[in-house]
From Swiss-Prot:
This is Photosystem I P700 chlorophyll a apoprotein A1. The lineage of its organism: Eukaryota, Viridiplantae, Streptophyta, Embryophyta, Tracheophyta. The PsaA/B heterodimer binds the P700 chlorophyll special pair and subsequent electron acceptors. PSI consists of a core antenna complex that captures photons, and an electron transfer chain that converts photonic excitation into a charge separation. The eukaryotic PSI reaction center is composed of at least 11 subunits. One of its GO terms (cellular component) is photosystem I. Pfam families: PsaA_PsaB (PF00223). Signal peptide: none annotated.
Length: 750
């Protein structure tokens, strides 16, 4: 740590009334661009309007102005999020069976959407139990509400109104901090202050207040609910907060107040701050006392972290010093210059944030089922499948976004003149070695992973099961994964005092947990089938990385187009007269990367869906016999391509295909419609621009003949626009098809 003389006092960091509020200006389409503001000559105008409306770099090159626009837009985003949350809570209050579900969560399904019988579509209101008819929801909101101690629909109403107030507040803040008091550039670049506020404020105090809420409100209310007390009889949250004796009846140490804390007799608090591991056998969720303890610990860590950086007082770390000291023996200048990059290029900053948030989202997907945090979440199979799928897709998109903004940084913000021998420069100088090695890895993984399946299909087709790779013939056991599982299964009692079970039941060792005759979780066995599909995961992920990384490393120049940086982030080809230079822009790499991201995530969610139905989810008899949904067929069926097609896609599609005439029929329509949207995308992806331009000119001729030709000239989509429309419909169609397939299946059988 470097101790310096105090920094000069903070200057005034806002400009007053920098930009007037003008509805006349905003009402003019394309007011942000001289060219677009002139109005349309051709139909390309509307596409350019959409492409550039939020590309603040194209409006101005003034970093301060760009920063203010981004900052203001963030408040708008928060406003929309609050509005959405309010809608969710309002549906819970107005259209849901939450109170009924709360009284019997094992036999009643969650529903917060009731279809109005306008054209006879009330068939969609299925019987979710308890005499309620509505659409079964799979968002997990009911489970979150129970975990946070919400016991009535009135409380949901109040929260919904509160969220609306916050939405309005955020809208106001977005306007205020752009038009009335706009921060100066120095404020956006003061990273130490930002770290202090975000770490100590958002994460530290945020976690602390959540831990406080859990201890004082959630834990007592959930204890009553678990004991079967009628929600209407349970004291209201404010009674627990104001009346300590009420809590002391449940947790005797509350009678002593803060004395044990100040006398360091902290073990007194172990009644409500536990470290048990495993799941609560009543609800099938993590112990809420473990979760409260976790948030308290996280709060302490982040409150400390928030005090590590040097601001107005001359004590603490400076980010620039940390980065410039970050040198290894083989990395030249190391991170020198990175501080300047990250404080002047928001694309570089965003790229890092997206990569980390995307990875974190995928980590969340894997923890939601292996350590289900909310009561009765683990036995709600449709919600479990939805949460996993949702977080996987979101994580995939965020990671592709990271590559997109890294490439935009390279094209727009990277200045090669003052970068020499730092880490980025060194990576760029040996990019050929990186990409060619990565390419070799992809070829190796592709041939070998698919080769194992093709071998199995061939042996199966020839009637030679003894020569297949399977748990019953030639075994390829995932020994490293099994070793990790065993290590974790044996960990309790060694890692933390009082820990009675491992972090997740999936590791093994523990008994299964069942709630209301349904399996919540049990040790997940891994075998040859998992080994095979794991290598498909490795293959698809490496190909996605190859495409995205090549796009970033060759964004500015390549042997084919040495001056690529001058052509920008997205361009169709390197001008006329240079054949073979189309589809090489950084944008095109993002475009291609999206398809492989889609491949990668699809295999993951298919693996998860089938594995859980085969080896985890199911019912348990009074004698303790478990019957899985697909009877454990994953290990023997998923080892051939044919098995995936026959026993997963075809066999499990029967529910969505046969859904007509039932309350699941909307999924049947979506399944059909989303296939159509997906097929529609191929029209854009498989045909060239000239084809459409010729067609349009014939159609324009016909319009002229009839004297109904429009003033705005029709134009075919540009190459880049066509590919953008194509990939959008491809992903939208593919994801919605998967959604309908998964939900119709799991709601019917789960």
């Amino acid at each position: 740590m470097i101790i310096r003389s105090p920094e000069p006092e903070v200057k005034i960091l806002v400009d007053r009334d920098p930009i007037k509020t003008s509805f006349e200006e905003w009402a003019k389409p394309g007011h942000f661009s001289r060219t677009i503001a002139k109005g349309p000559d051709t139909t390309t105008w509307i596409w350019n309007l959409h492409a550039d409306a939020h590309d603040f770099d194209s409006h101005t090159s003034d970093l301060e102005e760009i920063s203010r626009k981004v900052f203001s837009a963030h408040f708008g985003q928060l406003s929309i999020i609050f509005l959405w949350l309010s809608g969710m809570y309002f549906h819970g209050a107005r259209f849901s069976n939450y109170e009924a579900w709360l009284s019997d969560p094992t036999h009643i399904g969650p529903s917060a959407q009731v279809v109005w019988p306008i054209v006879g579509q009330e068939i969609l209101n299925g019987d979710v139990g308890g005499g309620f008819r509505g659409i079964q929801i799979t968002s997990g909101f009911f489970q979150i509400w129970r975990a946070s101690g919400i016991t009535s629909e009135l409380q949901l109403y109040c929260t919904a109104i509160g969220a609306l107030v916050f939405a309005a507040l955020m809208l106001f803040a977005g306007w205020f901090h752009y038009h009335k008091a706009a921060p100066k550039l120095a404020w956006f670049q003061d990273v130490e202050s930002m770290l202090n506020h975000h770490l100590a404020g958002l994460l530290g105090l945020g976690s602390l207040s959540w831990a406080g809420h859990q201890v004082h409100v959630s834990l007592p209310i959930n204890q009553f609910l678990n004991a079967g007390v009628d929600p209407k009889e349970i004291p209201l949250p404010h009674e627990f907060i104001l009346n300590r004796d009420l809590l002391a009846q449940l947790y005797p140490s509350f009678a002593e107040g803060a004395t044990p804390f100040f006398t360091l007799n902290w073990s007194k608090y172990s009644e409500f701050l536990t470290f048990r591991g495993g799941l609560d056998p009543v609800t099938g969720g993590l112990w809420l006392t473990d979760i409260a303890h976790h948030h308290l610990a996280i709060a302490i860590l982040f409150l400390i972290a928030g005090h590590m950086y040097r601001t107005n007082w001359g004590i603490g770390h400076g980010l620039k010093d940390i980065l410039e000291a970050h040198k290894g023996p083989f990395t030249g200048q190391g991170h020198k210059g990175l501080y300047e990059i990250l404080t002047t290029s928001w694309h570089a900053q965003l790229s890092l944030n997206l990569a980390m948030l995307g990875s974190l989202t995928i980590v969340v997907a894997h923890h939601m089922y292996s350590m289900p945090p909310y009561p009765y979440l683990a036995t709600d199979y449709a919600t479990q499948l939805s949460l996993f799928t949702h977080h996987m897709w979101i994580g995939g998109f965020l990671i592709v976004g990271a590559a997109a903004h890294a490439a935009i940084f390279m094209v727009r913000d990277y200045d090669p003149t003052n970068r020499y021998n730092d880490l980025l420069d060194r990576v760029l100088r040996h990019r050929d070695a990186i990409i060619s090695h990565l390419n070799w890895v992809c070829i190796f993984l592709g041939f070998h992973s698919f080769g194992l399946y093709i071998h199995n299909d061939t042996m199966s087709a020839l009637g030679r099961p003894q020569d297949m790779f399977s748990d019953t013939a030639i075994q390829l056991q995932p020994v490293f994964a099994q070793w990790i599982q065993n290590t974790h299964a044996l960990a309790p009692g060694v890692t933390a005092p009082g820990e009675t079970a491992s972090t997740s039941l999936t590791w093994g060792g523990g008994e299964l947990v069942a709630v209301g005759g349904k399996v919540a979780l049990l040790p997940i066995p891994l075998g040859t089938a998992d080994f095979l599909v794991h290598h498909i995961h490795a293959f698809t992920i490496h190909v996605t990385v190859l495409i995205l990384l090549k796009g970033v490393l060759f964004a500015r120049s390549s042997r084919l187009i040495p001056d690529k940086a001058n052509l920008g982030f997205r361009f169709p080809c390197d001008g006329p007269g240079r054949g073979g230079t189309c589809q090489v822009s950084a944008w095109d790499h993002v475009f291609l990367g999206l398809f492989w991201m889609y491949n990668a995530i699809s295999v993951v969610i298919f693996h998860f869906s089938w594995k859980m139905q085969s080896d985890v989810w199911g019912s348990i008899s009074d004698q303790g016999v478990v019957t899985h949904i697909t009877g454990g067929n994953f290990a023997q069926s998923s080892i051939t391509i044919n098995g995936w097609l026959r026993d997963f896609l075809w066999a499990q599609a029967s529910q969505v295909i046969q859904s007509y005439g039932s309350s699941l029929s909307a999924y049947g329509l979506f399944f059909l419609g989303a296939h159509f949207v997906w097929a529609f995308s191929l029209m854009f992806l498989f045909s060239g621009r000239g084809y459409w331009q010729e067609l349009i000119e014939s159609i324009v001729w016909a319009h002229n003949k009839l004297k109904v030709a429009p003033a705005t000239q029709p134009r075919a989509l540009s190459i880049v626009q066509g590919r953008a429309v194509g990939v959008t419909h491809y992903l939208l169609g593919g994801i919605a098809t998967t959604w309908a397939f998964f939900l119709a299946r799991i709601i019917a059988v789960g």
